[in-house]
């Protein structure tokens, strides 16, 4: 009898607990945030699932497309990365987010188009990002919030490479100079004569050196 009353008491306590507990459902923001945790841990297939769920929950959730784009990049599906980024660029910023998601998307588009050898598009998106961050009142930089080793200097070196591929050596040299000044503000101007084959070869070698230096930093 006592055993039966104990079971009945436990049963009623469980009913009260279930009735009182507030139901919690993951939002698109929760899903994207967890996707970024997985991304930062290198779990790209899993992060893909969470970012996909995020935009299924809300087709206008910008950071979900942003996460998908960067994840596709890690999975070396660059065409899909571009598509995700381009969709994300049309979506509104989440007012609760501190970081400007459009900046991350523009950087992602710059890197993806450069890897695809779409140099004109890489220049378009990269120049757009550099212009936007230079309008900042404070520090005129960009750092990818989910990997601090990726920043505006990587955008500059990508632009230097794409401008070189487009035979615009003056612009290419300008981006190289911006990187060198950022790394050492006291350094003298780095000048080469890009009207000569020797000068262009020197510029190409410097771009390659800076790419390797930034990757190793």
Feature roles, as predicted:
Residues 149-150, 157-161, 165-217:
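Terminal, low-structured helical/coil segments at or just beyond the last alpha-helical repeat
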